[in-house]
């Protein structure tokens, strides 16, 4: 069975939504939402508006990762899904395919330099990562070459996919965007198509960690090695992509840093076997189903009452090592007031 429900713009248009979703103006889940605890998820996706979320500050790691993905995709992709003038996702022919790699890297590096650092530490990262982007990109090209991506057709990037209730049993769709899908061309009765790719690739970049201040006042940095095993959250993301194609397409998870690349697949990672992917997809659905049940208990109330009653049942985990970082002091105070801790 091929799970093809091409999502171009808004999951809201895919099917009827439950009452709580309509009242709270939510229409989908995503692997990113899985990766944060319930309390942080509730605040970011039910309290903050989409505009407020988009206004949250980025950091140098995120911007550098975007730069690397852009370089790899612009050089290799046949098609890149992008938002058009009316905020509608559309597959567009890549006009920069096979353009000189170094030229693309220089252009993306210049765009990265436009990032406005959040603080002194982020500024130090910004300066450091400018020196690392070239190496990370080159390792990315090497990894993709090893997988034979460059010689396959078609290569599609940033395709938005949606898993609906028929597959997940959730009220809301689960939405994601693939870094790369490649291959799978078929010819039938003279018509060439690629209904199912030959492979799915998810790329994760790693950047040197900030160390202690030197006597000179400069920041020291610690180089990272590729992980011995993938991040659980990254495997969840891969499982979502695999489920979309009914686990018929192999998934490759690539880690890149300035020193090396590492490719995980079903041969060296249990989480990327069919059984592992199915298990992780089930785990993701379980988390989202819990959140739906929490909200549905109060769906006959008004939106603010739904939020307040749900908050009373959730630990905000303000001590979490990263999920409340970068949310801004004003929003953090707002969240703590919501949970009555200040």
Regions found by a protein language model. Give the residues of each.
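Metal-dependent nuclease catalytic cores that hydrolyze phosphodiester bonds in DNA/RNA
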Residues: 1-192
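Short, mixed charged/polar active-site loops
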Residues: 171-175, 194-200, 261-263, 267-269
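Metal-dependent nuclease catalytic regions and adjoining charged, substrate-binding loops involved
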Residues: 213, 228-232, 243-342
């Amino acid at each position: 069975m091929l799970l093809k429900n091409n999502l171009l713009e808004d999951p809201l248009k895919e099917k009827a939504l439950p009452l709580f979703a309509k009242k709270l103006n939510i229409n989908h889940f995503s692997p990113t939402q899985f990766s944060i605890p319930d309390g942080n998820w509730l605040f970011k996706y039910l309290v903050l508006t989409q505009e407020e979320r988009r206004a949250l500050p980025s950091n140098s790691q995120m911007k550098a990762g975007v730069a690397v993905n852009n370089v790899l995709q612009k050089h290799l992709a046949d098609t890149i899904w992008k938002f058009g003038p009316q905020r509608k996702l559309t597959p567009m022919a890549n006009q920069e395919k096979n353009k000189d790699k170094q030229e693309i890297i220089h252009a993306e590096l210049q765009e990265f330099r436009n990032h406005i650092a959040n603080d002194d530490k982020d500024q130090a990262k910004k300066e450091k990562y400018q020196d690392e982007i070239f190496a990370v990109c080159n390792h990315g090209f090497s990894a993709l070459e090893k997988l034979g991506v460059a010689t396959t057709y078609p290569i599609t990037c940033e395709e938005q996919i949606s898993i609906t209730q028929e597959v997940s049993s959730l009220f809301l769709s689960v939405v994601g965007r693939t870094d790369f899908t490649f291959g799978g061309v078929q010819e039938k009765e003279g018509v060439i198509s690629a209904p199912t790719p030959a492979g799915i690739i998810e790329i994760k970049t790693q950047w040197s960690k900030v160390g202690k201040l030197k006597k000179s006042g400069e920041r020291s940095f610690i180089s990272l090695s590729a992980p011995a095993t993938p991040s659980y959250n990254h495997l969840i993301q891969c499982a979502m992509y695999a489920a979309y194609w009914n686990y018929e397409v192999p998934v490759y998870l690539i880690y890149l840093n300035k020193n090396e690349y590492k490719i995980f697949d079903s041969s060296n990672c249990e989480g990327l076997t069919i059984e592992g992917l199915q298990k992780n997809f089930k785990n993701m659905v379980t988390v989202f189903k819990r959140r739906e049940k929490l909200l549905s208990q109060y769906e006959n109330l008004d939106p603010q009452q739904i939020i307040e009653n749900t908050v009373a049942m959730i630990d905000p985990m303000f001590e979490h090592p990263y999920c409340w970082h970068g949310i801004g002091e004003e929003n953090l105070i707002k969240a703590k007031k919501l949970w009555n801790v200040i």
